[in-house]
Amino acid sequence: MTTASQTPVGDGPGPRNAAPAGDGPGTSGPVPAGSHGPGRRRSAADLRALAEEAGERFADATAEEVLTWAAEEFGDALAVACSMAGDTVLPHLVAGVHPGVDVLFLETGYHFAETLGTRAEIGTVLPVTVIDVLPRLTVAQQDEQYGTDLFSRDPGACCALRKVEPLGRELAGYEAWVTGLRREDNALRRHAQLVEWDNTHHMVKLNPLAGWTFDDVIAYAGRHGVPINPLLTDGYPSIGCEPCTRRVEPGEDPRAGRWAGLAKTECGIHL
């Protein structure tokens, strides 16, 4: 089994971290600094054409069919982004066709203890390589530079610093990424395709769970013994950083507990 603790960067045991280094993504060539990916072999134009063709071909495919194709097409240039919330079935699905796949976890420094526990369990029981993707600033450094509790004063800026920029830096070394987007989450995600072009990161984006419901996710996890975040069944159908997430009331949008009381509904990594 390949896990973060058994396959670190460098020598000796320890967690595999994406050190904050280097600048933005390129379209092809050597591995960008700050990414664990193998680098991009194809140009953005070639990847876009591939995404558009596959989007049509797999419009009505199953998650397994899409991921089998992706594993064959991209190999180690395929990464999974997992929040260790409602998407832990993703590493299980991808590992079934591509054992050892890199699973990117945005370690913001503000996670629920339950989320960190789920991350540790996934890295132990599944044949995947969990990579902690780190912001350039620690929480203490961010507090010193921007003032304490930036998340309460400017949540958009906090998400940009702790999620959007780190993920973009890490994805620059891959050609395709797998996400846990589901159409039922909210109106902004209603038209998510199984395979699509990511115009922000200039790469192929796969949403194999797009047509799944919350109940589908829980049922799959139960059938296959996949660890799930215990908060999911405790009133948190959508889980983000602890200071910005509350329980969802019956009848509310699944993401109503994220940034409650604000117009903000997305952290920015899917925009």
Q: Where are the predicted features?
A:
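Nucleotide-activated chemistry modules centered on ATP-dependent adenylation/adenylyltransferase
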Residues: T2-L271
